[in-house]
From Swiss-Prot:
Belongs to the globin family. Changing K143C: In beta-B chain. The keyword Repressor does not apply. It comes from Cyprinus carpio. Red blood cells. GO terms for molecular function: haptoglobin binding; heme binding; metal ion binding; organic acid binding; oxygen binding; oxygen carrier activity; peroxidase activity. Heme b binds at H63, H92. This is Hemoglobin subunit beta-A/B. The keyword Transferase does not apply. Gene3D superfamilies: Globins (1.10.490.10). One of its GO terms (cellular component) is hemoglobin complex. Heterotetramer of two alpha chains and two beta chains.
Length: 147
């Protein structure tokens, strides 16, 4: 993947404004609420019976922060995302048996949450374009083991 200077700047600037203690948990909770079939991969997390239960679930929040940590690693090494995510791809494919389409669903929820936080001025079409390109590269890296 080739990144323009403008794309790199937009992604890094947006990331610098995000609070990983908020975005990750919020995006994962949104994914579990909006796409309830994704909950089957989180059965060990306890009460996921309602949106309020999901939003208040500490295990969901903790895993959301883990997701954000993974994104941080990708941002720090944007030219090597496939290698960065290779072990995660193997784990999600071979150990956890996660449906690879769920990565895209979560990426969409991350985008929605970022857009809601920053609004049209902070999440302009140019920023969105760069951010979605970045998340698409991450999703494809996570799906790599499935092919």
């Amino acid at each position: 993947v080739e990144w323009t200077d403008a794309e790199r700047s937009a992604i890094i600037a947006l990331w610098g404004k995000l609070n990983p203690d908020e975005l990750g948990p919020e995006a994962l909770a949104r994914c579990l609420i909006v796409y309830p079939w994704t909950q089957r991969f989180f059965a060990s997390y306890g009460n996921l019976s309602s949106p309020a239960a999901i939003m208040g679930n500490p295990k969901v929040a903790a895993h959301g922060r883990t997701v954000e940590g993974g994104l941080m690693r990708a941002i720090k090494d944007m030219d090597n995302i496939k290698a960065t995510y290779a072990p995660l791809s193997v784990m999600h494919s071979e150990k956890l048996h996660v449906d690879p389409d769920n990565f895209r669903l979560l990426a969409d929820c991350i985008t929605v949450c970022a857009a809601m936080k920053f609004g049209p001025s902070g999440f302009s079409p140019n920023v969105q374009e760069a951010w979605q390109k970045f998340l698409s590269v991450v999703v494809n890296a996570l799906k790599r083991q499935y092919h």
